[in-house]
């Protein structure tokens, strides 16, 4: 009986591991698609599995960076602004000179040639982000984590704090 139970536990652990990998691949694929990465779900899965893929070098590196961040995700305290900036540095490795720093210029989101959103002035970004992290820390015991993460996401998108990579974060 003990051997059968061990087999069941091993099978269950394998299923959990496969589900985690599948979830990670889908998350990476969808967050990069927001930033116009054209790699297919299958290509993202292959990159995560350390297989060779034909495609745009920058897009492949975006997947590698996101995967590396996932591998180290438990090392970050997401309620800590400094850790959040470190995560952005890793996510944007090899791409931007200002990765891990808030933007120092205006930011607009466009659909074609039409401006559909203008972010707050760059001079306001550090104080807005500090206020957001303070809000999260002050309310983590009173507000359910799912609601709190939704609030964080809403204001993060509103502030649009980075020159690039906001959708990946």
Residue ranges, per PLM feature:
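FIC/Doc superfamily catalytic core
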Residues: 1-169
């Amino acid at each position: 009986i003990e051997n059968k139970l061990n087999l069941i536990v091993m099978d269950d652990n394998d299923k959990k591991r496969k589900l985690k990998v599948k979830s990670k691949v889908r998350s990476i694929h969808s967050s990069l698609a927001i930033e116009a990465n054209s790699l297919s779900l299958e290509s993202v899965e292959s990159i995560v599995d350390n297989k060779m893929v034909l495609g745009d070098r920058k897009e492949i590196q975006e997947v590698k960076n996101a995967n590396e961040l996932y591998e180290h995700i438990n090392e970050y305290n997401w309620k800590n602004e400094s850790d959040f900036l470190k995560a952005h540095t890793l996510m944007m490795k090899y791409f931007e000179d200002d990765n891990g720093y808030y933007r120092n210029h205006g930011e607009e989101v466009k659909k074609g040639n039409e401006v559909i959103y203008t972010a707050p002035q760059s001079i306001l970004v550090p104080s807005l982000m500090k206020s957001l992290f303070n809000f999260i820390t002050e309310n983590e015991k009173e507000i359910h984590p799912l609601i709190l993460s939704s609030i964080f996401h809403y204001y993060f998108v509103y502030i649009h704090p980075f020159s690039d990579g906001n959708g990946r974060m």
